[in-house]
């Protein structure tokens, strides 16, 4: 047998507590019993199987426990006859006792260095499970015989006499059901133990990782420090089996107190007994979830690398397109400059054509003057010539003309002759030709900017990548489309500028209206105060008139009585006060003052009415002016928008005409080039001397 199968035999001397099972001892006894007759040689499974074999081994161990219970039941059939009613409860008790026995077995395992060693406990548990599995594998297949014999013995002992086979079968089924229940309980206990073992194993792995990190840090720190022979000796002693004494371990560290304080991890490594078998443990296989997670991580890494490459490719394509755009912008500026030069050259050519036409008309009129031709043609030609010369002078000098054109209706002395006008026209044509010669017009379009050789390949690669993936392809804009977009953008910008100008004008009108309203505010406040004062005066006058009407039936004597009925001044006042009171309430003066106040009130009312009418007139005039200004502003805006639209239409037409003229000019240039080439070839052919004829030979005749 192997060493793992015979390892738990040292526990035979120990007696298990009463009421508990010793699975290791029983498994070893079963292995010896199985190997007594025929000693087969088998190799237990290695420990490196890890957690993947714990489940099947627990089931096998559960079945082995079931076989051992069968043996005990076979051995003690007489006792079962005596205690038949207690049989159904016994498996449950054994099932509850099995985990306790396993726990007690764990507790009875001697620790390595005085500390709980989880690895040794795990090894002992695995060895016991392997022994149970080996015993179950080598158990003879005829194990149903003892069961049947046990069943028949139980049936013979428990029955009163002869019973049918149905009763024995029922009892056998009940016994097997009880055994199945016990096995399930044992399996559940084993599963709980497996879960605890897995949890402890995870904790050990975490601790192992932390220890490895600390060991790495310690190694780095040792590499930074000076080498010491005592340190290496102490590390060698600490990494052994742990049997060296504490004095031998303490001596080198006492000489290096600072080093031990700087590195307390060595003491921990030496005192921790579980670190002695870190190197002996095999690598645990990863779970399927970990494999799936690793595969997903690898896939994500690959996707990230692909995206990085694609990003770099896109940046390269972008740089290439940026360079091409810069080149296109330069070409566009060059084309605009060429278009401007062509436009100016065309304008000069038109002016030259018009000048030649006027000069031809002058020549015809001058030549026909002797034949009594009408003078109207000559005058019209001279007017056209002076108009062209005036345009040139206006173009050359934007200010006032220093040399005004002479009037043809003047005297014959001041009037220039047609020859002088023709001379001026010829000089004008010469100046136009000189200006046209200053324009640099290319007969052929310049070379276009050649694209970079890497740009099409990169673009093709990007298009291929985008074609394989979901999403739109890269936009490919032509030059005409870019120009159209540019023209549309310029038109939109012009519209926005026009709207901005309109908004600014509206804002200015609103500001003026606000200023006018602010100026009218104080006038309205003054008018409101005047109206309030008038209303108060009218209310006071109405009260006085109502009092006068109520006492109108009385005579003047009543008024005198009312004046005399005023209360006298108490205490015998002086005569001065009495005179003042008499003067204050004199009826004649009071009537005069009332008449004067009434006249003033009427005058003020008339002035107020006149001011109100003037204010209304001013307000009406202001409203009329504002309405007129608003209408004028709207008309101006409409006219401006119409002018803008007309300008755009004219600009488009001019552009179309310019394109047509450019095409015609290109065709004419091509035709002229062909004609010039034909003429040059003809001239060369005519100017080339003929070779002399060879002398005639005998027999030849001159034709």
From Swiss-Prot:
Comp. bias (Basic residues): 1-15
Comp. bias (Gly residues): 572-581
Region feature (Disordered): 1-113, 138-172, 228-256, 396-416, 540-583
GO MF assignments: PDZ domain binding
Keywords: Coiled coil
Coiled-coil residues: 189-227, 289-309, 476-513, 596-681
UniProt tissue specificity: Highest level of expression in heart, and moderate to low expression in skeletal muscle, kidney, liver, small intestine, placenta and lung.
Composition skew (Polar residues), residue ranges: 400-410
Domain of life: Eukaryota
Protein family according to the UniProt entry: Belongs to the MCC family.
Complex and partners: Interacts via its C-terminus with the first PDZ domain of USH1C.
Entry protein name: Harmonin-binding protein USHBP1
Organism per entry: Homo sapiens (Human)
């Amino acid at each position: 047998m192997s060493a793992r199968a015979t390892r738990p035999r040292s526990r035979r001397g120990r007696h298990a507590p009463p009421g508990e099972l010793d699975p290791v001892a029983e498994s070893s006894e079963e292995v010896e019993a199985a190997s007594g007759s025929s000693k087969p040689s088998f190799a237990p499974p290695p420990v490196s199987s890890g957690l993947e074999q714990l489940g099947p081994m627990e089931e096998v161990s559960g079945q082995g426990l079931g076989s051992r219970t069968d043996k005990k039941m076979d051995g003690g059939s007489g006792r079962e006859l005596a205690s038949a009613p207690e049989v159904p409860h016994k498996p449950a008790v054994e099932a509850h006792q099995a985990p306790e026995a396993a726990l007690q077995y764990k507790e009875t395992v001697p620790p390595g260095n005085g500390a709980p060693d989880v690895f040794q406990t795990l090894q002992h548990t695995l060895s016991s499970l392997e022994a149970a599995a080996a015993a179950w594998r080598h158990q003879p297949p005829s194990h149903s015989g003892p069961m049947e014999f046990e069943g028949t013995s139980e049936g013979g002992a428990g029955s009163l006499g002869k019973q049918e086979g149905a009763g024995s079968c029922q009892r056998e089924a009940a016994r097997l059901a009880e055994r199945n229940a016990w096995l399930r309980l044992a399996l559940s206990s084993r599963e709980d133990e497996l879960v605890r073992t897995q949890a402890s194993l995870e904790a050990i792995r975490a601790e192992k990782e932390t220890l490895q990190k600390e060991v790495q840090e310690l190694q780095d720190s040792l590499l930074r420090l000076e080498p010491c022979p005592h340190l290496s000796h102490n590390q060698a002693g600490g990494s052994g089996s742990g049997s060296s004494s504490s004095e031998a371990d303490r001596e080198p560290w006492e000489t290096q107190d600072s080093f031990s304080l700087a590195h307390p991890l060595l003491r921990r490594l030496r005192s921790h007994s579980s670190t002695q078998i870190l190197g002996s443990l095999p690598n645990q296989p990863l779970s399927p979830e970990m494999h799936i997670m690793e595969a997903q991580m690898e896939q994500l890494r690959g996707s990230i690398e692909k995206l990085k490459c694609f990003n770099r490719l896109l940046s390269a394509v972008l740089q290439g397109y940026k360079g091409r755009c810069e080149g296109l912008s330069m070409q566009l500026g060059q084309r605009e400059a060429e278009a401007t030069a062509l436009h100016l050259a065309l304008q000069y050519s038109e002016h030259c054509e018009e000048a030649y036409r006027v000069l031809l008309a002058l020549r015809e009129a001058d030549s026909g003057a002797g034949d009594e031709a009408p003078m109207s043609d000559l005058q019209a030609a001279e007017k056209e010539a002076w108009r062209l010369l005036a345009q040139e002078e206006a173009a050359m000098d934007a200010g006032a003309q220093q040399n005004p054109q002479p009037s043809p209706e003047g005297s014959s002395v001041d009037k220039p002759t047609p020859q002088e006008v023709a001379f001026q026209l010829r000089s004008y044509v010469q100046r136009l030709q000189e200006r046209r010669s200053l324009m640099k017009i290319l007969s052929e379009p310049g070379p276009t900017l050649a694209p970079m050789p890497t740009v099409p390949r990169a673009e093709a690669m990007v298009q291929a990548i985008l074609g394989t993936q979901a999403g739109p392809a890269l936009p490919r804009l032509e030059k005409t489309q870019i120009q159209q977009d540019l023209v549309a953008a310029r038109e939109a910008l012009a519209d926005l500028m026009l709207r901005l100008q309109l908004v600014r004008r509206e804002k200015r009108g609103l500001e003026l209206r606000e200023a006018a309203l602010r100026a009218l505010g104080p006038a309205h406040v003054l008018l409101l105060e005047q109206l309030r004062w008038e209303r108060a005066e009218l209310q006071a006058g109405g009260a006085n008139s109502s009092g006068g009407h109520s006492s109108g039936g009385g005579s003047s004597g009543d008024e005198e009585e009312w004046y005399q009925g005023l209360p006298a001044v108490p205490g015998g006042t002086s005569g001065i006060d009495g005179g003042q009171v008499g003067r204050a309430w004199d009826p004649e003066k009071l009537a005069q003052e009332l008449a004067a106040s009434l006249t003033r009130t009427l005058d003020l009312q008339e002035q107020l009415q006149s001011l109100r009418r003037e204010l209304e007139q001013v307000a009406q005039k202001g409203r009329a002016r504002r309405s007129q200004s608003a209408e004028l502003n709207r008309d101006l805006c409409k006219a401006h928008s119409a002018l803008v639209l007309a300008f755009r239409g004219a600009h488009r037409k001019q552009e179309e005409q310019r394109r047509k003229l450019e095409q015609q000019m290109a065709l004419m240039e091509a035709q002229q080039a062909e004609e010039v080439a034909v003429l040059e070839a003809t001239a060369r052919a005519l100017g080339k001397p003929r070779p002399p004829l060879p002398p005639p030979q005998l027999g030849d005749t001159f034709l």
